[in-house]
């Protein structure tokens, strides 16, 4: 069902769109915390884990409400599958943000230049997705532009990821360095997976925009 048939100028946001906005904002808040930690802005690893976990819990609650409302609502402003999948991918982004820090803590891995770039770019992608969801009702074409920017940023993350992996293999010349490489590669993969989810969220937004304009 097209969004233009449900929304009118000046009307309050539909509850599903508002829940998606709230969820995207929580994800952005979490990635803001992560990016600041990578820039060494006086946040301890333990404190970051607690704060990221709190954001994750808040976002999960929003998603639970959204799914419950989907079950109890006959007519939705967007296709049910699109609402569900967009919420899922946004949720996964924050989950991977948390598990990135958790894995770094468990594997005793410090941040490096590649991780700093990847996380900063992911934070920007999350910001574009949050803007896309906010513009979806009144300005779907603008929402599509933000979704395309998010996809471009995801491509940048994957390029940094490939460069980082290549550099790791070049440095691994003995057993200890090999173990370090394997641990660090695991962290890179967490951020790469986060980027994949951002790309999937952007794809869903693109499909929504095509249906409503």
Language model features with spans:
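Cytosolic, long alpha-helical scaffolding segments
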Residues: 1-213
């Amino acid at each position: 069902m097209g969004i233009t048939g449900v929304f009118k100028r000046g009307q309050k946001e539909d509850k599903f769109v508002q829940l998606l906005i709230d969820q995207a904002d929580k994800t952005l808040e979490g990635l803001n915390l992560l990016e600041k930690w990578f820039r060494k802005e006086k946040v301890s690893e333990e404190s970051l884990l607690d704060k990221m976990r709190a954001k994750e819990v808040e976002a999960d609650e929003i998603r639970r409400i959204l799914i419950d409302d989907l079950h109890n609502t006959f007519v939705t402003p967007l296709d049910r599958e699109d609402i569900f999948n967009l919420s899922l991918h946004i949720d996964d982004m924050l989950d991977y943000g948390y598990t990135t820090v958790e894995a770094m803590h468990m594997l005793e891995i410090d941040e490096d230049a590649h991780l700093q770039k990847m996380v900063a770019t992911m934070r920007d992608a999350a910001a574009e997705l949050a803007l896309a969801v906010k513009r979806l009702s009144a300005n779907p074409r603008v929402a599509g532009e933000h979704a395309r920017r998010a996809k471009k940023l995801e491509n940048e993350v994957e390029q940094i990821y490939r460069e980082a992996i290549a550099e790791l293999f070049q440095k691994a010349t003995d057993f200890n360095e090999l173990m370090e490489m394997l641990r660090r590669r695991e962290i890179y993969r967490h951020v790469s997976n986060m980027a994949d989810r951002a790309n999937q969220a952007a794809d869903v937004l693109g499909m929504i925009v095509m249906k409503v304009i």
